[in-house]
């Protein structure tokens, strides 16, 4: 008898609208908690609520105009046939949604921070990764398949952006930028190894959020929470980066309005690569890699599930060329789907887990 891992029998099945409300409440409670922990009062909480709200409203409203345009341009998603069968009905849903909420969120951040040089830098990185994703999405649409630009080309472009950002940090950063700060006031001087780590973090984080973007509202909602957690972490040292993270969090919330189940639009690589690049850029520039690692727990687990699945399959491959699988399907959210969880159950649980990780990342900063 097959063991049912992660049985969903006792879990409710929330609607997409319920999850949007849950996400909004979670973000508000996190903003209140972080403000209290930082200042022991709620005075000044508007400094975070305002950029989150402005960005969310702007992106949410813009979506009502852009989504019909994307549909008219025939940017319908091509769904992989070897994926969950329940996803086949998603074919034709407009993709490349990142093209409207990413630039708006970055623009609001630039204005709100009065074009702080650090915000300009991470904004450029974000838009650069967005363009890499857009090229990939565009190739998918042109070829009418689920394959965009080659993995090698995508990786080279991601590395190129990472290298340029690292060169900028090397040119403008403090002498201590290559130190890795860990909990307990432990500081590890990495020297030149920091730059290798920085490039890896930028590429890995952008791909991790990309892998997570496989269920309606999953990547956008978890990123909204992650950005808010990162905003609280960087607030004591950089108001500009705090505003940037708050705006990206709001942008994701505005996008969830349209991306909640059943999704009216997907962010595509255009959005997911940009979000990961933005998280990594802020974490590196602010010297908060440990906090970034904690709040990105969902993304890394999703990535590790793919790595483990592929590695185990290759390691157990027999004479017939077939191997064994650890999961029913990778990444993890697809395994949960095939184990009986609904999309909304997965998203709701992941939201709550990521909220806990955001708090943990803030406390252990």
Swiss-Prot record:
GO cellular component: plasma membrane
Keywords: Cell cycle, Cell division, Cell inner membrane, Cell membrane, Cell shape, Cell wall biogenesis/degradation, Magnesium, Membrane, Metal-binding, Peptidoglycan synthesis, Transferase, Transmembrane, Transmembrane helix
Compartment(s) where it occurs, according to its Swiss-Prot or TrEMBL record: Cell inner membrane
Superkingdom of this protein's organism: Bacteria
Reaction(s) the record says it catalyses: UDP-N-acetyl-alpha-D-muramoyl-L-alanyl-gamma-D-glutamyl-meso-2,6-diaminopimeloyl-D-alanyl-D-alanine + di-trans,octa-cis-undecaprenyl phosphate = di-trans,octa-cis-undecaprenyl diphospho-N-acetyl-alpha-D-muramoyl-L-alanyl-D-glutamyl-meso-2,6-diaminopimeloyl-D-alanyl-D-alanine + UMP
Pfam families with a match to the protein in the record: Glycos_transf_4 (PF00953), MraY_sig1 (PF10555)
PROSITE patterns on file: MRAY_1, MRAY_2
Region forming the signal peptide: none
Disulfide bond entries: none
Classification via InterPro entries: Glycosyl_transferase_4, PNAcMuramoyl-5peptid_Trfase, PNAcMuramoyl-5peptid_Trfase_CS
Presence of keyword Cell inner membrane: yes
Ranges that cross the membrane: 19-39, 47-67, 91-111, 115-135, 155-175, 184-204, 224-244, 281-301, 344-364
Membrane topology recorded in Swiss-Prot or TrEMBL: Multi-pass membrane protein
Keyword Protein transport applies: no
Main location: membrane
PANTHER family (UniProt xref): PHOSPHO-N-ACETYLMURAMOYL-PENTAPEPTIDE-TRANSFERASE (PTHR22926), PHOSPHO-N-ACETYLMURAMOYL-PENTAPEPTIDE-TRANSFERASE HOMOLOG (PTHR22926:SF5)
Protein name: Phospho-N-acetylmuramoyl-pentapeptide-transferase
Biological source species: Gloeothece citriformis (strain PCC 7424)
Gene this chain is encoded by: mraY
